[in-house]
From Swiss-Prot:
Family indicated by similarity: Belongs to the chromogranin/secretogranin protein family.
GO cellular component, one term: secretory granule
Name of the gene: CHGB
Protein's name according to its UniProt entry: Secretogranin-1
KW 4Fe-4S (keyword) present: no
Compositional bias annotation for Acidic residues: 262-272
PROSITE patterns with a match to the protein in the record: GRANINS_1, GRANINS_2
Organism field: Homo sapiens
Annotated positions of the Phosphothreonine modification: 79
Modified-residue entries (Phosphoserine), positions: 93, 99-100, 130, 149, 183, 225, 259, 263, 293-294, 311, 335, 367, 377, 380, 405, 533-534, 617, 626, 631
Length: 677
């Protein structure tokens, strides 16, 4: 027992040593290991007292084990290093960018020490430099520029998704306040503006941001309209004193105006790439357009010399819509492209809130179209009103919506209507004016649609259904007055067919009545809809020139054959469930494509019935001699059978049993044929 255990132990050690040999030294040590194993096994088998392992073999095993441990240690270190590189390139890139930012502008380094959450978000979104993790350890291995941009973009998108919900209400609240300042900033910014100026003004902007956050938290519980009007007046007073700091302020709070300017100008490649990636998802959160709408909406008011109160009213009213309305679609876009808005709306006559349509339109082309808002002139406003006023007059003339259309037309031709319809009272615009304007913008250019809608209003849904029912069922109703009810819907060709098919109506009515009578006679669950065959109606309507006399003869023949002496074809089928209209199928040869199969089926059924009848007549001769009418051929057969044999022998009984078994088999085969046919 002991040598066996020793041998197994030595074999395991030898195999482990061979398997754990390094790849590099395998050729060198393979012979040594093999020789050691052979020596150990031979010694164990020959001498039980011999030493199990020689010193040379022990040295070889130690060397191989040491190589294995070194290899495992090296692999673990490499794995840890790779994991660290995969996990921490963002931190390394942040450290790299922080150092480069410090070299670019020293004033920015003061603000890195203790950034608040709001400042962190502002700096990450507006400037494009990542400083959320500035206090984390910085690695000395820097990845490439493309990897830096990808990692920073990923971290920005993740952080924005977490903080969007927290800051959504506050940012929507501040969008209306900064509309005028953002428009000023868009015109004051120059392509040559450097990053140092941005870093110098960042500290002042962060202080103003803190003040506004405090004011917002104190006044947010009050009513929406009072709160926004008060904060708008306060921001308008401060804008004159702090024009330099407010110039870049919308960039820090929202990050989009600045980032889109930089993406076009190409100041810094990595920063612009990160900002473009950062701002694209925000197009679909319904939060980028309000800033642009405030910019675009305030441009005309400032350039044309409007009072500041008028632009304030429009911006405050738009901000009051907040999360519910699409500001950009109702302010800037509508004033620039009113005809397109009308043409797109006309396809949706019943929609009451156009924000979904505008959303779909800006999803495709908003990013290209609004990077640099275009200033509008007096001529563009006048042309807009000239285009829109015919549709408003059509509004009043066509349906007499007096109050709303009068209110629209009574406004100033240029500025007043725009600020009233687009910014002054947005709720009224969405609820009432938009519905009418949408309808008649489409109808002014396409009166055909209005005619169709008027037709639909003149004929309610019930009337249309009644007319269709009368038109489809005129063959069974048989009333000539139905044609006069359909005079408006049929053209001259149908009216000519009316005179040609007057007589055909009565004949089809006659045949339909016969079919109904026969169906009710044989099917207790008769449904008249089964007999409304589209094939028959088509033949009646399209005048297939079939002979009515021939059809009448066929009906009378089939009527006689419903109860023949023994119509074996009928009794084999399922008369009360599936094949109630078998006579119709026999007439319509197109419905029975396999005539040979039909004949075979009929022969099998007839043979089955004959065998069944012979068996019954032999068992009950007196019963079958009753008054039941039978054919002459069957009578002759019965008389012959009764004359030849009155009592069946054993052989005859066996034959009858065999015939009955064959009968069952034939019935099964016939059912299979019928199912396939």
């Amino acid at each position: 027992m002991q040598p066996t255990l020793l041998l197994s132990l030595l074999g395991a050690v030898g195999l482990a040593a061979v398997n754990s040999m390094p790849v590099d030294n395998r050729n060198h040590n393979e012979g040594m290991v093999t020789r050691c194993i052979i020596e150990v096994l031979s010694n164990a088998l020959s001498k039980s007292s011999a030493p199990p392992i020689t010193p040379e073999c022990r040295q070889v095993l130690k060397t191989s084990r040491k190589d294995v441990k070194d290899k495992e240690t090296t692999e673990n270190e490499n794995t840890k290093f790779e994991v660290r590189l995969l996990r921490d390139p963002a931190d390394a890139s942040e450290a790299h960018e922080s150092s480069s930012r410090g070299e670019a502008g020293a004033p920015g380094e003061e603000d890195i020490q203790g950034p608040t959450k709001a400042d962190t978000e502002k700096w990450a979104e507006g400037g494009g430099h990542s400083r959320e993790r500035a206090d984390e350890p910085q690695w000395s291995l820097y990845p490439s520029d493309s990897q830096v941009s990808e990692e920073v973009k990923t971290r920005h998108s993740e952080k924005s998704q977490r903080e969007d919900e927290e800051e959504e209400e506050g940012e929507n609240y501040q969008k209306g306040e900064r509309g005028e300042d953002s428009s000023e900033e868009k015109h004051l910014e120059e392509p040559g503006e450097t990053q140092n100026a941005f870093l110098n003004e960042r500290k002042q902007a962060s202080a103003i941001k803190k003040e506004e956050l405090v004011a917002r938290s104190e006044t947010h519980a009050a009513g929406h309209s009072q709160e926004k009007t008060h904060s708008r007046e306060k921001s308008s007073q401060e804008s004159g004193e702090e024009t330099g700091s407010q110039e870049n302020h919308p960039q820090e709070s929202k990050g989009q105006p600045r980032s889109q300017e930089e993406s076009e100008e190409g100041e810094e490649d990595a920063t612009s790439e990160v900002d473009k990636r950062r701002t694209r998802p925000r197009h679909h959160h319904g939060r980028s357009r309000p800033d642009r709408s405030s910019q675009g909406g305030s441009l005309p008011s400032e350039e044309k010399g409007h009072p500041q109160e008028e632009s304030e009213e429009s911006n405050v009213s738009m901000a009051s819509l907040g999360e519910k309305r699409d500001h950009h679609s109702t302010h800037y876009r509508a004033s620039e492209e009113e005809p397109e808005y009308g043409e797109e709306i006309k396809g949706y006559p019943g929609v009451q809130a156009p924000e979904d349509l505008e959303w779909e339109r800006y999803r495709g082309r908003g990013s290209e179209e609004y990077r640099a808002p275009r200033p509008q002139s007096e001529e563009s406003w006048d042309e807009e009103d000239k285009r829109n006023y015919p549709s408003l007059e059509l509004d009043k003339m066509a349906h007499g919506y007096g109050e709303e259309s009068e209110e629209e037309r009574g406004l100033e031709p240029g500025k007043g209507r725009h600020h009233r319809g687009r910014g002054g009272e947005p709720r009224a615009y969405f609820m009432s004016d938009t519905r009418e304007e949408k309808r008649f913008l489409g109808e002014g250019h396409h009166r055909v649609q209005e005619n169709q809608m008027d037709k639909a209003r003149r004929h309610p849904q019930g009337a249309w259904k009644e007319l269709d029912r009368n038109y489809l069922n005129y063959g069974e109703e048989g009333a000539p007055g139905k044609w006069q009810q359909q005079g408006d819907l049929q053209d001259t060709k149908e009216n000519r067919e009316e005179a040609r098919f007057q007589d055909k109506q009565y004949s089809s009515h006659h045949t339909a009545e016969k079919r109904k009578r026969l169906g009710e006679l044989f099917n207790p669950y008769y449904d008249p809809l089964q007999w409304k065959s589209s094939h028959f109606e088509r033949r009646d309507n399209m005048n297939d020139n079939f002979l009515e006399g021939e059809e009448e003869n066929e009906l009378t023949l089939n009527e006689k054959n419903f109860f023949p002496e023994y119509n074996y074809d009928w009794w084999e089928k399922k008369p009360f469930s599936e094949d109630v209209n078998w006579g119709y199928e026999k007439r319509n040869l197109a419905r029975v494509p396999k005539l040979d199969l039909k004949r075979q089926y009929d022969r099998v059924a007839q043979l089955d019935q004959l065998l069944h009848y012979r068996k019954k007549s032999a068992e009950f001769p007196d019963f079958y001699d009753s008054e039941e009418p039978v054919s002459t051929h069957q009578e002759a057969e019965n008389e012959k059978d009764r004359a030849d044999q009155t009592v069946l022998t054993e052989d005859e009984k066996k034959e009858l049993e065999n015939l009955a078994a064959m009968d069952l088999e034939l019935q099964k085969i016939a059912e299979k044929f019928s199912q396939r046919g």
